[in-house]
Amino acid sequence: MNKTLFKSIREYKKQSLLAPLLVILEVLMEVLIPLEMAKIIDVGIANGDLTYIVQRGVILVVMAMLALYFGVQAGNMAAVASAGYAKNLRHDIFYKVQDFSFKNIDHFSTSGLVTRMTTDITNVQMAYMMSIRLLARAPFMIILSWIMTLLLNKTISLLFLIVIPLLGGTLIYIAKKAHPHFIKVFDEYDVLNNSVQENVNASRVVKAFVREDYEIDKFHDISKYVYNLFTKAEKIVAWNSPVMQFTMYSVVLIMVLIGGKSIIAGSMETGELTSVIVYALQIIGSLMMVTFVFVMIMIAEASSDRITEVMNEIPEMQDQPDAVTKVPNGDIVFDHVDFSYSGEGGNLSLKNVNLHIESGQTIGIIGGTGSAKSSLVQLIPRLYDVTKGRVKVGGIDVRDYSLESLRDQVSMVLQKNVLFSGTIYENIRWGDETASDEEVKRVCKLAQADGFVQEFPNGYNTKIVQGGNNVSGGQKQRLCIARALLKKPKILILDDSTSAVDTKTDALIRKAFREEIPNTTKIIIAQRVSSIEDADQIIVLDGGQIMGIGTSEELLKTNEIYREVYESQVKGGGDHE
């Protein structure tokens, strides 16, 4: 773990400090217990002094109870500190992600961010809890036990000066070997999660095409690859335990030989040898504890690197200190705009786009798949930044606005409509959380959603399940349009957002737009000519370039692409009733 992540401890610093302090007190009691046992054996039992045995026994019990108390309290403090640390980490990452542009999110992928906020943070949480308890306990136990061994038998104490560095070096070597493998494992967890996410989201498609076996095989291959990577890492870590066990038995055997000779020579008592063996076991037990924590830390180190990646990611878009906070109107200008998702030097999705949309106009955009229709409109609310040129809204470069102010005045209904778990009221109020019930119903009427909502048994209090799977595609689109309208934006963008709506309802929505929001700039991307033929201007896109601008009548005369689309749909009866 590093400085970036430690900042998230914040209000849990007190518990994080108290836990190791209580552990030290627990260790102190545990180290004194064998000394009392030696006195009971060498003095009380050797002399048959029952009073002495009882007196020392009471002290022994008190020490054990204190050790128990300190241990329990240390555990409680460590649990609170680690759980709080994990809570803060999740909050910090989630807060950070809210500032990410689409490009930042694309860099990590959705499944990658989810893994970091769940599995990776849990790994860091567990390692942190172990660290503030066991990493405080082990060094003090080793040092104090070694000092007590030194006081009882110098020869045996020297044995540990050889053993401890050897074991420490072995642990460091194992850790360095295993760490890269754990990083690979967690990177593959992203792929695994992505596979699960895709399958669950597309479960209807999977079943419709009877592709369950294919999906199972695909998941099995990814899962097996993760298994192989994890096994490779664990095989390296697995050397920890045998090395420790071999060391423990060897040390105990050597101690018994040295201690036995000392007892025969009269330089050591039986109780003292017993105490030395207990101290030796405490030292070796602490070293084994360190190996266990070491494994946790190795896993957590890989996770913390991935979390730090997110925390150190610089949001591509940031507000300027003197950012403009008011959008004057819905006037839009594209001035020699080039755009690439890969940035400077990448393949251009949009090439030398020059365009002026007057405030209040209705603009239609049409073009084939991959013609960059969505790319064009995503530059208006600054979901992405232009690679070259500039986009202006209300006469001001979009990069000069605060993101919140700009996006508050640009309502965009994306191709992929998203509804959240909650009631219809709650979903629509995403556009304006202070809106009254009447305002919600008004925008639903404009979006032609009020009719079907009223037919639900619970009306606007109907619960939308996750992903909006209990409403049809057309209903989902209309609810999303209503949500966008509730913002009362200066610019409304519909990115193929009426594709699942019948042409009659589509016409009613456009009629409502003309009559109820005439001053709002309306940009409609559509595959159907009927959805845009009454627009003030229609933009024809092909290969990221504007191939024509004009009314439907003008384009029929001057633009071959538009004429072909129009004739294939209208004359062929493809979409007119």
Features from the language model and the residues they span:
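Conserved catalytic Walker-motif region of ABC-type ATPase nucleotide-binding domains
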Residues: 97, 219, 307, 334-336, ...
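Transmembrane helices of ABC transporter permease
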Residues: 11, 15-28, 39, 60-63, ...
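Membrane-integrated ABC transporters
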Residues: 1-30, 37, 45-59, 74-78, ...
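Juxtamembrane helix-loop junctions of ABC transporter transmembrane domains
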Residues: 21-22, 29-42, 54, 63-110, ...
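Short intracellular "coupling" helices and adjacent cytoplasmic loop segments at the cytosolic face
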Residues: 47-48, 83, 91-115, 119-121, ...
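Helix-loop-helix
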Residues: 48-55, 144, 148-162, 232-306, ...
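ABC-type nucleotide-binding domain
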Residues: 326-577
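An intracellular "coupling" helix at the cytosolic face of ABC transporter transmembrane type-1 domains
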Residues: 10-13, 77, 99-103, 119-132, ...
